[in-house]
């Protein structure tokens, strides 16, 4: 499947491919970042088990640990954010194929900034469910993330 210019385009292409292969609109699809190679089997099983009968779907997430600040464009703190209401979105994210396809396609037409599948579903008026996962399912985006992952995996032996 050919990737798109952004994540949403890549996922949309994958969903179109699934449709072409005979997948139904009410089939579940899971979207996972290749940049998150440390997904645990327990988290995957938990996500599948807790969302299988959910009307919308959802995603793995972890509660924010650190104090969070909202800043202005100059880097000045405007306020401290209540972290009890803030979660970090992880993957995989699990939604019905048809609903996710419509949400992504419509958001692209509307030129809405979509950062993950859950944000597309939110834009479409749905409320995805958060399933608490492990914090070590981190996204490898910085050199120190890769070094942490290498150390973690070398300790498994």
Residue ranges, per PLM feature:
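Glycine-rich beta-alpha junction loops
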Residues: 63-66, 135, 144
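Short aromatic/hydrophobic "clamp" motif used to bind/position activated sugar donors
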Residues: 29-30
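Short phosphate-binding loop-to-helix
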Residues: 1-26
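Conserved core of the sugar-phosphate nucleotidyltransferase
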Residues: 25, 38-129
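Hydrophobic helical membrane-anchoring modules
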Residues: 137-157
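Acidic metal-phosphate-binding loop of nucleotide-sugar-dependent transferases
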Residues: 7, 34-38
